Amino acid sequence: MLRRLFVSTFLIFGMVSLYAKDLEVSVRSENTLLPIHVELNIGPNDAKQTKYLRSLCSIFVKDLALGDRLQPLLVKSGEISAPFSIVISSHYPELVFTLSRGTHNPRPFHSLVLTEDIAINRQKIHEVADKIHYALTRVPGISSGKIVFSLSKNPHDGELKQGELWSVDYDGENLRALTQENSLSITPNWLNIGSNNPYFYVSYKFGIPKIFLGSLENTSGKKVLNLQGNQFMPVFSPRKKQLAFISDAYGNPDLFLQGFSPSQGAMGKPRRVLNESFGTQGNPSFSPDGSKLVFVSNKDGRPRLYIIQVDPEIQTPRLLTKKYRNSSCPSWSPDGKKIAFCSVIKGVRQICLYDLSTGKDYQLTTTPIDKEGPSWAIDSHHLVYSAGNSGESELYLLSLITQKTNKIVIGLGEKRFPSWGGFPNNQ
């Protein structure tokens, strides 16, 4: 039985800044995997503890492989032969992670103390796996983030549709209800700032859609704006402290900007970015530096993607892609080099990618089921999106490196509007 202990996760000897430089590897090709052997050294534990430690080790190996750059393999004691190795030593409830490169002397890299809370222990394993992934590749690991999404079930005759926000790990574990508003909550979007993992979302609990601020620590949403009309699709730039959203406060669904601080709330008055003559706007997404927005407009008839500079001055929008004319849900990658979006191709909404460096766009998915809402992981090489039809929808992971998809098995219900974030700022 796990004992209740004070949670302590710490770095040993400042190894991330020092030893990581010795361990760093340049993976030249995105299709090249670095072999790593993982060994679990278990002390004199009872059978239940041994089984639990092995399950945590399996999670660790899966976490390392998630980024599609490392090829971890769990081996028995004395069988390590890969260029890099990780030994997990159990001094229950403490786990020590030791890294070795070739014949170099092994050095302790990280240590953690297990608690009796399985969810906390899983998160600790995710975080150490991501730290090691970053130390070896200089690419952020992606197993420690959270995916927040809207989960709804088909209403009975005459009932209004309801949906609450939930969070889940990439592997479908640690499923947790966030809102309990008995209403419809949609389009959550991480702020990627602060230690309490805040996110914006839209709720219909007051009758018409308004923007609220929630967090993993405080799930009771707080209304953000005192603005008339419907409010939709909030996104935030932590660099510029700006909230972008869509509102019909002046009659037409337009793009707005609002200064915002998680601690102080809205700062100043919202600014309308475009006038009504430009058409109907939707789906804004900030560039990483917060100077630009990509959004959807139907000013030319069909919804298409546009980019507009909003800082230091608002400029005229420009058309992003001419290849696809029925586009939606753009999402700017954290590295600033790519924009994922949806477009209707041969009658099916598919996930596509626009490369800002080349000006070319690509179709990423091909299956005959509608997809929507792509959201980036912190490494800019993996996406989560929803796929389904009216009344049913599931979440999927997509790797740009392998071009493979993987369903997140959650259970019954319609899952939509995923947002991948909440990554610890420790890589």
Swiss-Prot record:
Keywords: Periplasm, Signal. Its main location: periplasm. InterPro entries: 6-blade_b-propeller_TolB-like, PD40. Residues 1-20 form the signal peptide. It is found in: Periplasm. One of its GO terms (cellular component) is periplasmic space. Gene3D superfamilies: TolB, C-terminal domain (2.120.10.30). Belongs to the TolB family. PANTHER family: PROTEIN TOLB (PTHR36842:SF1), PROTEIN TOLB HOMOLOG (PTHR36842). This is Protein TolB homolog.
